[in-house]
Amino acid sequence: MAAVDDATGLEAARKQKIHNLKLKTACLENEELVQELHVSDWSETQRQKLRGAHLKAEELVAAVDVGTKWNLTEVYDLAKLMRVCGLEMSQRELYRPEDKAQFMDIIAMKKVLQDLRQNRNKTRVVSFTQMIDNAIAKVEKVEEDVRRSQLDATQLAQVPTQTLKQVEDIMNVTQIQNALASTDDQIKTQLAHVEKTNEIQNVAMHDGEMQVAEEQMWTKVQLQERLIDLIQDKFRLISKCEEENQAFSKIHEVQKQANQETSQMKDAKRRLKQRCETDLKHIHDAIQKADLEDAEATKRHAANKEKSDRYIRENEDRQEETWNKIQDLERQLQKLGTERFDEVKRRIEEIDREEKRRVEYSQFLEVASQHKKLLELTVYNCDLAIRCTGLVEELVSEGCAAVKARHDKTSQDLAALRLDVHKEHLEYFRMLYLTLGSLIYKKEKRMEEIDRNIRTTHIQLEFCVETFDPNAKKHADMKKELYRLRQGVEEELAMLKEKQAKALEEFKESEEVSGRCWHRVQPPCDENNEEVLTRRSKMVEYRSHLTKQEEVKIAAEREEIKRALTAQLWCRWRAGPHRKQHCTHASNSVAAIIM
């Protein structure tokens, strides 16, 4: 298509050139005829012919003024415009009216935001509703601006991709309150069972049903161990939620990267806009300069034309005068004819130059206007791109701020919840540790009692063996039964101590937290030791009270035996000397027994 246009332009220029040449030839031929008439015979007819030729010359000169045209095809093009005006921007770097805007990625981003608006977690803890609505409004504004431009928004649409992904991920994070609801219900159920077990144990101990009380204590230990397991489950759930939430701690890096991308895009468009504005200024300056030159040239040509017309008129007037002096002024007439020929020739050349200049000026204005439109369109698109990029940057900033708020709030809630769970762990560990401590104390006392019974049974067995007492079999069976019972109690005691050590090991983390947060909390170990010492002190008081009563009875019995023995010895002493030695031996034996 461009080749056809060039061929058509060249053909038109060729025809116009032929036409101009014909006009010049006709005018010059007529001037030559004028010169020939100057040297011909001087007659009235010749003079009339000369006048007619002058009239025709005026018409031909007027035709040259009106009919001379120039079609320039290569005088002014874009390369010459850029060279003359010192332009930087080539057409490859400029937006064109036929360029189509690329905004499908913007529509896809709006679709992502609309999907996020339907997310079930968008109003939890930190609301995302307002942020998403603002983002959709900004994206719609960007889409509207891009549709009215020739911009390619593909790269711009990629900027908030990571931010929107972070928003979607944090909206889908597990809600810790819902995750812990089932565990809290199980803890409440276990606490209710523990309370019921305590009631049954208290009733059994009040009624003296020690076996039932011991079974209830074992049941309570199992329930409290289950409470510890549930607490550990809560810790695991909290840790899992913390791990999910930790992924959003570096949201500032996402925002920083997005800001860098938008800054680069803005800087690129600003540089492009600045270059276009610089070229526009150069074109405006060139147009103003061309306008001044055109005005000066037009004024100069008009002055030359007026001068030429005046000169031709004067020439004709002088020719008329010369006709009256034909004989005297022949040489002058010929000279004037020659001068006229030269002037007409010079004028034709001046007309050619002026018309050529006008065409060049017109072409310059046309090329400059087209390039000016492209530059102005590019500046417009740069402004739109900068505004759209700013809107996307605001979108990214608001999204990152919402993600950070959600992350900070979730971290605070998890920290507070972890502290509450540590409090629950302390309470349930205290219950379990005190229960195990009470059982261990009772089992140890039971062990001591069995050991005393074993020693007593062993002594009784030795007495029976010494005298071949048939009850020896009974004491031997009882001793075996006591050893079997002792082994069972020892295994239970070892199991209880193992449970106590395991619970203490699992309590270390909560113990550290309680040491940092609750300085006045009494450790369950110290509380258990105090209860054991209190229990032992109470038992010692009971034993001391019983021992005092036994000592009084024994002392009274010993006093009675002593009095009876004294009376008997007195009687034997009086019975005769042969019994003195026997009485002395008996007295020593009885004294030893009494002691």
Swiss-Prot record:
Its main location: other. One of its GO terms (molecular function) is calmodulin binding. InterPro entries: Flagellar_rod, PFR_Component. It is found in: Cell projection, Cilium, Flagellum; Cytoplasm, Cytoskeleton. Residues 294-317 are annotated as: Disordered. It comes from the Eukaryota. Residues 317-337 are annotated as: Calmodulin-binding. GO terms for cellular component: cytoplasm; cytoskeleton; motile cilium. Pfam families: Flagellar_rod. Keywords: Calmodulin-binding, Cell projection, Cilium, Cytoplasm, Cytoskeleton, Flagellum. Heterodimer of a 69 kDa and a 73 kDa protein. Coded by two tandemly repeated genes with almost identical ORF: PFRC and PFRD. Major component of the paraflagellar rod (PFR). The PFR is a highly ordered lattices of fibrous proteins that are located inside the flagellum and assume a fixed orientation with respect to the microtubular axoneme. PANTHER family: 69 KDA PARAFLAGELLAR ROD PROTEIN-RELATED, 73 KDA PARAFLAGELLAR ROD PROTEIN. This is 73 kDa paraflagellar rod protein. It comes from Trypanosoma brucei brucei.
